[in-house]
Amino acid sequence: MELELSLGDSPAPVKATIAPTPVLIPTCMGDEEDLELVLGVRATRRDEQDDQTTCTQSSEEAMEGEEDETRPHGEAPVESLSFPLFVSSAETGSANSEMCTRGFDVNTRPADGGAEAGRPSSPSSMQEASTRQQVADQEAADDEDNGGGGARKKLRLSKEQSSFLEDSFKEHSTLTPKQKSDLANRLNLRPRQVEVWFQNRRARTKLKQTEVDCEHLKRCCERLTRENRRLQREVAELRGTLRTTTSSYPPLYGLHHLPAAAGTVFRVCPSCEHSKVVAAAASESFSPRVFAGGGAPAAITAAAAVPSPGAGSPPSSSAALFGARRPHFGPFAAAVIPPVLRRQPSATS
């Protein structure tokens, strides 16, 4: 059986292989016989270590001779365990021995961090670093486009840029993506900056229009308030005039119960007033002895002879409404009834 051990991650020049050779050695202890397993280790090196082999050959032969003397007869020769690498490093301290001892280290980390920092980074770490840098640049660009986070930077435009943007806003208050990119290229700006400028301009326009509408509504409200007060004063005056009129004249067919409307003026019909005056004069000059003589009263004759003011002109609507249907009271009511209205006795009765 052959066992090969490879210690460390040593580069090219040194490679140590150990080939153990198990050997059974009988030992006599009392009446029992025991078997002892001895591993023989053989160290092989390359041509670069020939100088070390010559230095340690004499020491190996001396050690083998001592073992042969102490070993009982009949035993098989066993190669001694020898580690010439450690011996050479302890005695000579040459550069080759240091390299050999370094080959047995199993992935040991260097003591200082300078060596690790000096080594080139792996491709994965470089890719991660570049990705982080791209993300940071993108976030910075987004913050700048959006106006920044805590400290917002105001966009400074020249007079030419401002005038051109104002003219474009008068033509179109909103922009399509193509128009936005064209404006950005023409004014040497980013499309996001043009879009933000148009948004702010629309907001300012809407705010100004709201202020104008508010002022107009305030003026309208004040004007309506003054008009309402004036109308209330007129209504109060008209109600006072109506009360005065109804107290001076008798009620005319319940017109005093009607509500007073704005701008309405109540007038008394002249023909009705004249008829009332004539009737009063006739009642005052009436006497029973006048009828006894068979003559008509002078007052009535004079009243009949005096033409009414509206005789030469067609009667008005109010005169036709009130004068034609005025009831007649007195002893002369039978004389004015037409004879055709009297009921004649029938011939059959």
Swiss-Prot record:
<feature type="compositionally biased region" description="Polar residues">
    <location>
        <begin position="121"/>
        <end position="135"/>
    </location>
</feature>
<dbReference type="InterPro" id="IPR003106">
    <property type="entry name" value="Leu_zip_homeo"/>
</dbReference>
<dbReference type="Pfam" id="PF00046">
    <property type="entry name" value="Homeodomain"/>
</dbReference>
<dbReference type="Pfam" id="PF02183">
    <property type="entry name" value="HALZ"/>
</dbReference>
<dbReference type="GO" id="GO:0005634">
    <property type="term" value="C:nucleus"/>
</dbReference>
<keyword id="KW-0238">DNA-binding</keyword>
<comment type="similarity">
    <text>Belongs to the HD-ZIP homeobox family. Class II subfamily.</text>
</comment>
<dbReference type="InterPro" id="IPR017970">
    <property type="entry name" value="Homeobox_CS"/>
</dbReference>
<dbReference type="InterPro" id="IPR009057">
    <property type="entry name" value="Homeodomain-like_sf"/>
</dbReference>
<dbReference type="InterPro" id="IPR001356">
    <property type="entry name" value="HD"/>
</dbReference>
<keyword id="KW-0805">Transcription regulation</keyword>
<dbReference type="InterPro" id="IPR050762">
    <property type="entry name" value="HD-ZIP_Homeobox_LZ_Class_II"/>
</dbReference>
<keyword id="KW-0371">Homeobox</keyword>
<feature type="region of interest" description="Leucine-zipper">
    <location>
        <begin position="208"/>
        <end position="252"/>
    </location>
</feature>
<comment type="subunit">
    <text>Homodimer. May form a heterodimer with HOX1, HOX2 or HOX3.</text>
</comment>
<feature type="compositionally biased region" description="Polar residues">
    <location>
        <begin position="89"/>
        <end position="99"/>
    </location>
</feature>
<dbReference type="GO" id="GO:0000981">
    <property type="term" value="F:DNA-binding transcription factor activity, RNA polymerase II-specific"/>
</dbReference>
<feature type="region of interest" description="Disordered">
    <location>
        <begin position="42"/>
        <end position="186"/>
    </location>
</feature>
<feature type="DNA-binding region" description="Homeobox">
    <location>
        <begin position="150"/>
        <end position="209"/>
    </location>
</feature>
<keyword id="KW-0804">Transcription</keyword>
<keyword id="KW-0539">Nucleus</keyword>
<comment type="function">
    <text>Probable transcription factor that binds to the DNA sequence 5'-CAAT[GC]ATTG-3'.</text>
</comment>
<feature type="compositionally biased region" description="Basic and acidic residues">
    <location>
        <begin position="167"/>
        <end position="183"/>
    </location>
</feature>
<dbReference type="GO" id="GO:0043565">
    <property type="term" value="F:sequence-specific DNA binding"/>
</dbReference>
<protein>
    <recommendedName>
        <fullName>Homeobox-leucine zipper protein HOX7</fullName>
    </recommendedName>
</protein>
